[in-house]
Amino acid sequence: MVDTKKQSFQNMLDYVHLYRLKNKLHRETADNDRKIRDNQKRVLLLDNLTQYITDAMSIEEIRAIIAHMRDDYENRVDDYMIRNAELSKQRREIRQKMAAHKQAPTVKTTD
């Protein structure tokens, strides 16, 4: 009986270890995916910039293009930050509803 409990406990510890390892690998994979995506975007940005810039352009014209692109990206960042705030608010509301469900007494029926 004692050996069975020890084995059961060990199995649970192994399961927790594997679950944490799986989550760690998932986070690392997601992080690598973000890095790949970011670098692909940088390559695309440089390609786009190369298309806009010609040999006949002055430095001022090139700076104007870069400034315009920067403004566009800053606006996108602001939009994403606003969207994240909205999503955080929704998540907070859902957590509160879930907590309320946990606090609600359960009604047991007898047959």
UniProtKB/Swiss-Prot annotation:
Question: What protein name does the entry list?
Answer: Pole-localizer protein TmaR
Give a yes or no for keyword Ion transport in this entry.
Answer: no
GO cellular component term, pick one: cytosol
Which InterPro entries does this chain map to? DUF496 (IPR007458)
Residues annotated as coiled-coil are: 70-104
Tell me its family: Belongs to the pole-localizer TmaR family.
* Keywords (A to Z) from UniProt: Coiled coil, Cytoplasm
State the compartments where it is located: Cytoplasm
Species this chain originates from:
Haemophilus ducreyi (strain 35000HP / ATCC 700724)
Top-level lineage group: Bacteria
Pfam families xrefs: DUF496
Summary of the function given for this chain in its UniProt record: Pole-localizer protein involved in the regulation of several cellular processes.
